[in-house]
Amino acid sequence: YPTRICMMIDAGPRLRSGDDLFERGLLPFLRTTGPERLTLFLLSHGDDDHAGGAASLINHFSQKATRGVETPCSGRETWTWDGVRFSLLIDPAARTENDRSCTLLIETKAASAFLSGDIGRPAEQRLINLLPRGVDFLVAPHHGSRSPSSLIFVRRLAPKIVVFSAWKQGRYRHPHDDVVRRYR
């Protein structure tokens, strides 16, 4: 694998069959192309659609370094690996599991990304001043559901690329059309 650092964020859902998406989808790919170990596994929060495959991932990698699993995310933590700055941000006043999502800001000299977990508008409002004006890449909050992605948040981050992590045929029909329009 070309780099010494490999981090995985979330592990996908448990499927109705009892399998999980990590084991059925990502693991076969990683066995042929991926790393033999992870530097860090970050679990944004405990909802099944993010954590359903965590046990399989931890078992496969014999993973020791985890955040959001045994070691909860708290406050703000920043570190640098190979010239890339990582800032782990969490809303200290969060009242819901989603708003307690571990979020991650990744910055290099050339680009930046923000991975938002399932935060909603209250967490967006409390974290907004910790975020840069403009990012290159954003994983939209809560799969593009209607509640987060406030206009202030969208304008502050002004992402060049937005990814909505959602099933095409998902029961919640994410991303919501209004949210997609806000990012255009």
Where do the language-model regions lie?
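Non-globular, low-confidence helical/coil segments that flank catalytic cores
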Residues: 1-184
